[in-house]
From Swiss-Prot:
PROSITE patterns associated with the record: RIBOSOMAL_L31
Origin species: Neisseria gonorrhoeae (strain ATCC 700825 / FA 1090)
UniProt-recorded name of the protein: Large ribosomal subunit protein bL31B
Gene from which the chain derives: rpmE2
Gene Ontology MF annotations: structural constituent of ribosome
Pfam families associated with the record: Ribosomal_L31
Length: 91
C-alpha cells in the first residue's frame, strides 16, 4: 500500500437518525461541523445527523403508502362542483 493516502480525520462518528431516534457508531471521515452527542455508553462522539435511514424510510420499514390519484381528483371535483356550476351560469 502507498503511504499517506488515507485521510487524517478518520475517527468514530455517531450517525443519528432523528426521525427513528436511532444511531450507529461508525468509523468515518464525514464532516460533522463540530457537533457532538453523548451516546448510551456515556462517551461523547462527533455527531452526523440523518433525516432518513433504513430505520425510518418507508421502503425499508414496510410502512409504504400508495397514493390513489383517482380518488384525489374525484374529491377535488366534488368540492368545487358548486363553484364551477355557478361560474358557468354567469356566462
Amino acid at each position: 500500500m502507498k503511504p499517506n493516502i488515507h485521510p487524517d480525520n478518520y475517527r468514530t462518528v455517531l450517525f443519528f437518525d432523528s426521525s427513528a431516534n436511532e444511531g450507529w457508531l461508525i468509523r468515518s471521515c464525514a464532516g460533522t461541523h463540530g457537533k457532538t452527542m453523548v451516546w448510551t455508553d456515556g462517551k461523547e462522539y462527533l455527531l452526523f445527523s440523518l433525516d432518513t435511514s433504513s430505520s425510518s424510510h418507508p421502503v425499508y420499514t414496510g410502512k409504504q403508502r400508495n397514493v390513489n390519484t383517482e380518488g384525489r381528483a374525484s374529491k377535488f371535483n366534488q368540492r368545487f362542483q358548486s363553484v364551477m356550476s355557478s361560474f358557468r351560469k354567469d356566462k
